[in-house]
Amino acid sequence: MSTTNAINGNLYEQLHQGRTNMYKSKVDVVLGAQWGDEGKGKVVDMLASEVDIVCRCQGGNNAGHTVVANGTEFDFHLLPSGVVNEKCISVIGNGVVIHLPSLFDEVLKNEAKGLQHLEHRLIISDRAHLVFDFHQHVDGMQEAEKGGKSLGTTKKGIGPAYSSKATRNGIRVGELLGDFNAFSDKFKLIVATHLRLFPSINVDVEAELTRYRDYAEKVRPYVKDTICFLHTALRNGKTILVEGANAAMLDIDFGTYPYVTSSNCSIGGVLTGLGLPPQTIGEVIGVVKAYTTRVGDGPFPSEQLNEIGDLLQTRGFEVGVTTKRKRRCGWLDIPLLRYTSLVNGYTCICLTKLDILDTLPEIKVAVSYKKANGDKLDHFPGTIAELGNIEVEYAVLPGWQTSTEHIRNFKELPENAQHYVRFLEKELSVPVRWVGVGKGRESIINVH
C-alpha cells in the first residue's frame, strides 16, 4: 500500500512539474456580483483605455450597460462597452446570442453620438447563435402564460434562442454567411418547429429570408473565428478584458433559479463563451453596487419596501437600461456577495455608487441569514422557497452625510465612508481596488 501511495504521490507531483505556458498575457474579467446594473460598463470603459481587446462572452441584448465618455452617454446592449475606445478591438464571442436587427440599430444610434470606425474594430464570432423575431414573440407569449408568476424576462428572445441552441436546431452566424439555400432550409425547419408549439405566432418566411439575405452581407465584414483570434492575441502578449453581461445572481446555474437569465454569467461562462482555457484567466474583478438592486421578480432578502428603498431608487436613478422598469432597492447583502465570490473567485472589488448613500444618517448592511427556527445559515440557499423563509440580520454603520461626488482621493473620503469600504473588504476577504462616486470614468477612485 505504501509503495502504491509513494508511486501515486510521485506521479501527482510530476503532473504539476515542468508546466509550459504558451501565453504571454492573461485575460482579465469584469463580472457583476449582484443582480446586474452594478456599473460594469463604467469599469470596463475605465480599463479599456489600457487594453487591446474587449470581449462579450454571453447573453444578448437583454443586457444594458451605460458608459459616459467625454460628456456623452452611450447605451450598449450587444456591443462591448470597450467600443468607446477607438484603439481597442471589440469581440462578440460564441456564447452570445445576437438579434441582428437590434445590433445594427445599436450601431446606428451610437454612431449618431460620435462612435466611429466600428467596421475596423468589431469582430463577431461565426459560432454565435442568432435570435430571430419569432424567438422574441415566443418569449413574450411564454411570459404572458405565467400570469402572476412571471419571471420578469426582458422579452428579447434570449431564453428561446438559447433553447434552440440547446435542442440543436438553432442557427449560427456562420451558417447565415455560408450556402444561403442551406440557411433557408434550416430557417424554415426552425420556424415550423416553433409553429407546432406556438401556432398563433405569425412568421412571413419569405420576407424574413429576403431580410436575412441583406443582413448576411451587412454582417459579413465583422465575422471571424474569434477563438483563433483570441488565442493568437494571447500568444502575442495582447491584453484582453472580458465584460460579463447580467450578473452572478442571474446565472442560470448559480442564481435565484428560475428568476435568472438563460446563460452562465459567472466565470465559467467566460471560458465557454470565448473558447478559453482556465489558465488564461488573470484578474477577476467583482463589481459591487454600494447597495443592492434588482429588476423584475424574484427573491430579494435585503429589499426595502419603504422610504429607504424609495430614496435609493430616486437618488440612484434606478431604472433599467433595457427594460425601463424601476429597480427594486435594498441594503448591501454580504452573504450574497460571499456566495458570488465563492463561485467567481474575485481577486478584487470595484464598489460603485457610494455617493448615493451620502445623505443617510445610518446605513444597514445584511451580514447573515437565519432560518425560521433561529439557526444561522452557513450557505446561500439553493431554492427560492428556502431563500423566501430566511430572516436577515443587519449591522448598522454610521453614515457620513457629506457629498462625496467630487472627491478623487480615497483618503479624502469622509472617515465613515472609508469605514464602509473597509467593512466590505473585511467581510469578503477581498480587496476593494476602486470606489465609484459618480457617473463618469473620472469619478472612480483608486483605493490603493
Swiss-Prot record:
Cofactor: Mg(2+)
Binding-site residues for Mg(2+), renumbered to this chain: D37, G64
CDD domains in the cross-refs: AdSS (cd03108)
Primary site of residence: cytoplasm
Residues annotated as catalytic: D37, H65
The reaction(s) this protein catalyses: IMP + L-aspartate + GTP = N(6)-(1,2-dicarboxyethyl)-AMP + GDP + phosphate + 2 H(+)
Residue sites binding IMP per the record: D37, E38, G39, K40, N62, A63, G64, H65, T154, R168, N246, T261, R325
Chain sites annotated for binding substrate: V321, T322, T323, K324, R325, K326, R327
GO terms (BP aspect): 'de novo' AMP biosynthetic process; IMP metabolic process
Molecular function terms, GO-annotated: adenylosuccinate synthase activity; GTP binding; magnesium ion binding
Gene3D superfamilies: Adenylosuccinate Synthetase, subunit A, domain 1, Adenylosuccinate Synthetase, subunit A, domain 2, Adenylosuccinate Synthetase, subunit A, domain 3
Stored PANTHER family: ADENYLOSUCCINATE SYNTHETASE
Family: Belongs to the adenylosuccinate synthetase family.
Protein function: Plays an important role in the de novo pathway and in the salvage pathway of purine nucleotide biosynthesis. Catalyzes the first committed step in the biosynthesis of AMP from IMP.
Binding partners and assembly: Homodimer.
Protein name as it appears in the record: Adenylosuccinate synthetase
Gene source species: Drosophila persimilis
